[in-house]
Design a protein with these regions (language model features):
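Ankyrin-repeat boundary/"N-cap" motif
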Residues: 19-21, 45-52, 78-84, 111-120, ...
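Bacterial Sec-dependent N-terminal signal peptides
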Residues: 1-21
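Intrinsically disordered, low-complexity regulatory segments in ankyrin-centric signaling systems
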Residues: 19-38, 47-50, 58, 66, ...
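Short, conserved micro-motifs composed of acidic
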Residues: 177-452
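Ankyrin repeat A-helix N-terminal signature
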Residues: 23-28, 55-61, 88-94, 121-127, ...
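Ankyrin-repeat-protein effector appendages
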Residues: 20-23, 104, 157, 161-179
Length: 452
């Protein structure tokens, strides 16, 4: 599952795949809900750990919210990512339901247990009123997040000036702000083994939603996507004289989103996906694959990858073999995404070919990374028996040149959440991917136990 047009689903909009009882809560149909509760526990949780109360808050259904409270639903259950209904009220900027939940909570432990996470979301929303509300309720101004960031540090990092000014004026401790630098190979991070590690915390992996990362072959350029409240941008950091530059945004637009960066084999093009109109002026359209070309120290205007790649449906994620064959995902002529490849000949891409049943199923397959030598590929899929909402799977080429049946990469990589956006470094040593809205990495020795 991706961002852009799918972002609203990830943030609680109703999906056709949502189970009936959760869809009913989101629609606010109390009569229908009661009929379903005859055979379902009121504290049921969906695949992401969300309760009916999460859905009522996320879909802003006050009457449904009150009905669930009256029927005795638990009010402080966290989902798989630790988000409670109280957090959802902050996320969706619903002050009325937030106040109601605060009144219902049995004690004030939430101020220390969840205060950092609530401040974080309020600041990412650039919602000064919620920052003020949390302060009025007694949440400490210098409470920290799981990454050790104070509200003031977060506000300064994302340049939420009105919030940082207000926090400073009300006594936030400036001495707690950390200045994070990155030096040397892999941004100075200690390489992981068989346990995935958060990559470059508080420099790359911050309180924002980062995903879709790629290094160049030399390892001195790093590109990645960031979700800014539903609008996606691509950021860039460069190693110079041993120090990595502060990440800067190189592709953004007030109307369109850009994400899933990937370099062409010669590294003169940066490919990505976008909902940009073909003329660069109209309303956002379906998601296509685009690229920009290097021009000195900058980049050209976005160029559409053309009709042999793109369709009237949506195309996602890009990776390349050494010969320039592009692997990507598309949902053209179908109701779910599958993985395709397109050979590059004579300066253009050939008609795309869908991979066979060893890779594609009736489920969702996307976010494909192909080894440059085409010996294995890794992709995201949503399949029965998976560990979470979306898992990474791997397939290897056999001696006859066929893809082996893909297998789940297991709990060294996958979690109860959503794993996506795989990339393997040019030295073949590390797998990068997105998990829990951050970028993680792990040693590729994890592949060995997965080979057929």
């Amino acid at each position: 599952m991706k961002r852009l047009s799918f972002f609203l689903f990830l943030c609680f909009a109703v999906s056709t795949n949502a189970q009936s009882i959760y869809r009913t809560a989101c629609q606010g149909n109390i009569e229908r809900l009661d009929s379903l509760l005859v055979s379902t526990d009121i504290n049921t949780q969906d695949q992401r750990g969300r309760t009916l109360l999460h859905w009522a808050v996320g879909c802003t259904k006050k009457a449904m919210f009150e009905h669930l409270i009256e029927k005795g639903i638990q009010i402080d259950v966290p989902d798989n990512e630790g988000a409670t209904p109280l957090y959802m009220a902050v996320r969706f900027q619903n002050l009325e339901l937030f106040d109601r939940l605060v009144d219902l909570l049995p004690n004030t432990d939430w101020k220390m247990n969840s205060g950092g996470k609530l401040f974080e979301k309020a600041i990412l929303n650039r919602d000064l009123s919620f920052v003020q509300k949390l302060t009025e309720l007694g949440v400490p101004l210098d409470v920290t997040t799981t990454k050790g960031s104070t509200p003031l540090e977060i506000a300064l990092r994302i340049q939420a000036d009105s919030i940082s000014n207000w926090l400073e004026a009300h006594g936030a401790n400036k001495n707690l702000i950390r200045l994070v630098e990155a030096k040397g190979p892999y941004l100075g991070q200690q390489p992981p083994q068989l346990e995935a590690k958060l990559f470059a915390p508080n420099f790359i992996s911050t309180e924002e939603y980062e995903f879709g990362s790629v290094f160049n072959t030399a390892g001195d350029e790093f590109f990645y996507g960031v979700d800014l409240g539903g609008r996606n941008v691509i950021r860039y950091s460069k190693l110079s004289k041993g120090v990595w530059s502060k990440p800067e945004t190189i592709l953004s637009h007030e109307k369109y989103g850009y994400n899933d960066p990937f370099l062409s084999p010669d590294e003169n093009r940066l490919y990505f996906i976008s909902n940009q109109a073909l003329d660069g002026l109209g309303d956002p359209k379906d998601i296509d694959i685009w690229y920009v070309e290097r021009q000195g120290e900058g980049w050209s205007a976005p160029i559409n990858a053309g009709p042999n790649i793109n369709s009237k449906s949506e195309e996602y994620y890009i990776s390349f073999t050494e010969e320039g064959t592009m692997y990507f995902a598309s949902d053209k002529n179908q109701n779910h995404h599958d993985i395709y490849y397109s050979k590059y000949k004579g300066g253009r891409f050939m008609e795309a070919v869908k991979l066979g049943p060893a890779i594609n199923t009736e489920a969702y397959e996307a976010d494909v990374y192909v080894d440059p030598k085409e010996t294995y590929l890794i992709f995201c899929a949503q399949r029965e028996g998976g560990l979470g909402r979306g898992d990474l799977y791997i397939s290897f080429k056999d001696k006859e040149g066929n893809w082996t049946p893909s297998v789940n990469m297991g709990d060294n990589v996958n979690t109860q959440g959503h794993e996506l956006c795989p990339f393997v470094t040019a030295d073949g040593k590390y797998l990068f991917y997105t998990s829990r809205q951050d970028i993680y990495w792990i040693s590729t020795t994890v592949f060995e136990s997965l080979r057929p």
